């Protein structure tokens, strides 16, 4: 039901020190979101993208993509959640976001996008230290403290190639 995929985390973390910036602090741009209404396979999709990361110059420091998928329980029509369900899940995502990011000045992750489509919500972060995120999300799953069925995966993507489509969206 909840599979965990963490690809070569230990190897890459030891080879590449993503938390290091040669003693310099990295300025994280203030989040700016654009909302896109789209469709896929005949079903509506709502995509929320943090466009401030488009020109972010330190992408390699956040070289891990964390994708979290939460399944909605209460559905309206066309695979979209009811307003109450949407609010409930998005409030939960906000709590996850705070913990996954950690420090607000030098966060462990940056919020890239959220996609609501076909009965689920996918949230994407770019992460510095995947071990911290894996331990946090793994504990939620192992302790069954999640309000809705969820799954996640963390993959190495130093150049953000797998999520490049989100950096091309214009406000």
Predicted regions and their residues:
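Hydrophobic h-region of N-terminal signal peptides that target proteins for export
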Residues: 10-17
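Short beta-strand
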Residues: 111-117
